[in-house]
């Protein structure tokens, strides 16, 4: 793949594209299932006012909810993944719009669900479990729902909130289209006057260069462009903040932070303890940055100096094929069953590998009923190999959860999710250090791992400052 110019989607070889045909063979098949989803409000309405009627009725409704979840999973994964592979493709933006309209209709039709379920008396619900043992499958889900009784509104109010769903998503959608589909950055120029294309995918490799002129130029290209649209970005962020605050207040939470954490069953105190722990140990970060400044030999350390390795002449170029081989070896402690799933993902196009014009930036894993999908923007760097290990950790977690858990429990919260991914990163680092004798490369790897602490717990905690008292 060329590192100079980003290819169009049509120019990317098939083996490096994810196999979305595993969900739907054609767009027409997707449209057929969309019609099924559009018919769901009528089926949902048949249960209105009846959830406390009998164990059989409640069980049948929960089964219908599972059916809708599976249908939405397929429809949502196909439409979102198609849109993410080229955000400028209006066709799949249209798919997402149609799907969101159907989602809103389904959620609106089911607005009676939570008020009716929390109104069932505890003794009666226990009798339901006795009358129909199959209903016990949903006990934890029902208990979790009933735990939120203080934040559940009337049926009419719940319906209004359901109707705001598409509007609430707008700030995020606007920013995504602006950043991934519309924004273009001027080329960066190195010390020899050579131009380098700047994209979301190429930015980090550029600021990791040992050429300080190139690093500064790439930084000014990226952040200078965003700065030109600072009012647009600020207005979009403001709209997002207003949206989350609206939903928090509507549901009678003390704050948007409490509302966000409630669904994960994580107390606000745990979140605040994390922030305090990072702040109480920031002196280590200051020592590290001071050492970085000294090793780089610069009078002033700028933001564009933070990513370049402090170990000269030890850069590691790792192709995607090499990254796959190394990750397979590094994750051997996970066992043969785990490795078999990993190989299946590598060999059967679970991964969309390279950057192309309009492709969503960054990397992620998306669980799907057929199998997970992983979006990468691979650049043959050490960081990208760690990203592969990280995202495949999420992917295999999703695969195993979907395989072994009922539909209602197959999802998981982010606090659990990151264990599977960061464990893979730790195993990869352990493997690389164990199998690297060159002192410079070992130092390079240790520097990389230190950077993960700076760019993850430290940087992310810094981003929480506006939501806490530590400003």
Give the residues covered by each predicted segment.
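Catalytic glutamate of the conserved HExxH
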Residues: 387, 391, 395
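Post-HExxH zinc-binding segment in Zn-dependent metallohydrolases
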Residues: 412-438
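Auxiliary, metal-adjacent structural segments of Zn-dependent hydrolase domains
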Residues: 313-368, 381-382
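A sensor for short, sequence-defined functional sites
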Residues: 113-117, 121, 334-338, 443, ...
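A well-structured
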Residues: 1-313
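Conserved small/polar residues in nucleotide/adenosyl-binding loops
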Residues: 461-467
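Post-HEXXH active-site segment of zinc metalloproteases
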Residues: 398-419
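Short pre-active-site segment immediately N-terminal to the catalytic Zn-binding motif
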Residues: 375-388
């Amino acid at each position: 793949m060329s590192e100079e110019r980003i290819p169009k989607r049509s120019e990317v070889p098939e083996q490096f594209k994810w196999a979305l045909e595993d969900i739907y063979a054609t767009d027409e098949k997707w449209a057929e299932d969309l019609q099924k989803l559009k018919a769901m409000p009528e089926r949902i309405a048949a249960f209105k006012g009846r959830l406390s009627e009998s164990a059989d009725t409640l069980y049948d409704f929960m089964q219908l909810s599972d059916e809708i979840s599976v249908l939405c999973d397929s429809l949502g994964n196909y439409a979102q993944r198609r849109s993410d592979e080229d955000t400028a493709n209006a066709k799949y933006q249209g798919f997402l719009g149609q799907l969101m309209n159907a989602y809103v209709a389904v959620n609106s039709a089911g607005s009676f669900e939570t008020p009716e379920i929390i109104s069932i008396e505890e003794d009666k619900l226990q009798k339901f479990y006795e009358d129909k043992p199959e209903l016990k499958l949903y006990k934890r889900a029902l208990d979790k729902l009933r735990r939120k009784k203080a934040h559940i509104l009337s049926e009419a109010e719940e319906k209004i909130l359901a109707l705001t769903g598409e509007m609430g998503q707008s700030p995020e959608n606007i920013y995504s289209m602006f950043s991934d589909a519309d924004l273009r950055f001027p080329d960066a120029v190195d010390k020899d006057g050579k131009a380098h294309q700047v994209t979301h995918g190429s930015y980090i490799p550029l600021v990791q260069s040992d050429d300080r002129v190139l690093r500064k130029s790439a930084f000014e290209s990226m952040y200078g462009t965003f700065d030109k649209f600072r009012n647009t970005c600020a207005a979009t962020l403001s709209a997002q903040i207003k949206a989350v605050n609206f939903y928090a207040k509507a549901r009678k939470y003390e704050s948007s932070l409490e509302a966000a954490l409630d669904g994960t069953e994580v107390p606000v105190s745990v979140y605040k303890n994390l922030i305090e722990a990072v702040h109480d140990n920031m002196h280590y970060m200051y020592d590290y940055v001071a050492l970085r400044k000294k090793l780089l030999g610069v009078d002033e350390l700028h933001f564009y100096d933070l990513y370049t390795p402090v170990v000269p002449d030890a850069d590691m170029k790792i192709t995607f094929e090499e990254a796959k081989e190394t990750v397979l070896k590094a994750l051997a402690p996970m066992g043969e069953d785990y490795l078999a799933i990993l190989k299946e993902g590598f060999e059967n196009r679970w991964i969309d590998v390279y950057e192309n014009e309009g492709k969503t930036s960054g990397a992620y894993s998306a669980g799907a009923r057929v199998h997970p999908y992983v979006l990468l923007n691979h650049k043959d760097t050490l960081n990208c190999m760690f990203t592969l290990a990280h995202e495949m950790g999420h992917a295999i977690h999703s695969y195993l959860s979907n395989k072994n858990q009922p539909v209602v429990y197959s999802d998981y919260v982010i606090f659990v999710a990151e264990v599977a991914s960061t464990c893979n990163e730790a195993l990869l680092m352990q493997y690389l250090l164990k199998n690297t004798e060159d002192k410079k490369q070992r130092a390079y790897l240790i520097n990389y791992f230190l950077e993960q602490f700076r760019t993850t717990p430290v940087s992310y905690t810094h981003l929480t400052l506006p939501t806490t008292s530590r400003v």
